[in-house]
Swiss-Prot record:
The gene is gltX1. PROSITE patterns: AA_TRNA_LIGASE_I (PS00178). The lineage of its organism: Bacteria, Pseudomonadati, Pseudomonadota, Gammaproteobacteria, Legionellales. This is Glutamate--tRNA ligase 1. It is an enzyme of class 6 (ligase). It comes from Coxiella burnetii (strain RSA 493 / Nine Mile phase I). Binds 1 zinc ion per subunit.
Amino acid sequence: MKHIRTRFAPSPTGYLHIGGVRTALFSWLFARQNNGAFILRIEDTDVARSTQASVDAILEGLRWLQIDWNEGPYYQSQRMDRYREVIEQLVKSDDAYRCYCSKERLIELRNTQLKNKQKPRYDGFCRDKAPRQSNEPFVIRFRNPVEGAVVFDDLIRGTISIDNRELDDLIIARSDGGPTYNLTVVVDDWDMKITHVIRGDDHINNTPRQINILHALGAELPHYGHVPMILGPDGKRLSKRHGAVSVLQYRDEGYLPEALMNYLIRLGWAHGDQEIFSREEMVQLFDISAVSRSPAAFNPEKLLWLNQHYLKTVSPTIIAEAFATQLEKAGTDLRNGPSLEQVIALQAERTKTLKEMAQRSLYFYQEVRSYDEKAARKHLLATIVEPLQRVRERLASLPSWEKEAIHEVIVETAQLHQLKLGQLAQPIRVALTGDTVSPPIDATLYLIGRDSALKRLDHAIRFIHQGMG
């Protein structure tokens, strides 16, 4: 079997979006399961719109998702001489020609065709004319066949046939000599020996044109697979209005790469009823021919569910660094407080993203300076001062700071003062965290640590006394 070579070829004119990453994932999986090579190519010939920041974001996003590449990144902007060479080759073989049509003529042609309810297309005006010996500006057009059809077996959609009469002579070199997209893509796929082109179905109309250029060059055709687009929950094409669409935005919002990868592979592909896939299972089970031909609808709630699943199941050690980043963004000094792994293990069941986890864990690393007004009014009452003082004294005298011993102190104090456990636990929780929501109170006390816990209880008792005064 021929050595499989796939590629991902984004344009660095914006962020790396969800649709692009899913395409990259499918292409990467196909290469990996066939022991092939995955090539990264940056299509940066649009100099005006391409930015280094976009290139950096693409590379960073792929690395975050651990979509690694065997070759590249190759940059089209560094291959201009090669494109010009191929353009000259096509002109010499009479598979391309100079077109001197003015912009005005082409606009008039288009308007006439639209008026006559015809498909706008170039009419071949310069197709059989000899090159002019003048300095008039010209573009170079590919001489598309006028007979027969382009037929190819799409990996996802099956057999596709396009009549050559539906295709006009596309421009392959602009008036400044710069190559166009359809030319550069063909040359790159040819030179890089790409065997399988897996890309979005917005490129499907380009495929017959590119196949005809490859035929003219005498090149071997790759296999093509066109992945349907992703729709928003409202059924319209996924865009910024649907929320986060940049891959790095998901990272910054506290999603795990494992969750996003798992979610994307299920967008348009399924393996029975299985929802959770390890990276190894993705490589083993993914089948490009089983990808749905219909657009997939993006479901933010499903992604959140998956993210929480991975928060609960991935080792805290693996996500500690990302959690630290979220805490630091919230202005937290991590030198004081429990280990990140301990907090992750405690909070994973209660939060859906690392960002939410960080926001709900600030009190482990910061002193509580104020209380939620409603929580204080309900729980920090004069009647609770004596039980709080008792808890504070008992905690201070514990021989060792262990969860079981802490729990006993709270239970015994509640019984002594004829309180239900919640009637004592909630005031302690407000004292420790400033609010009424936290993990179990004994675990919260344990992680906050004895010294900090005692200070916070003292502060709450003073707060109540001030209110009484």
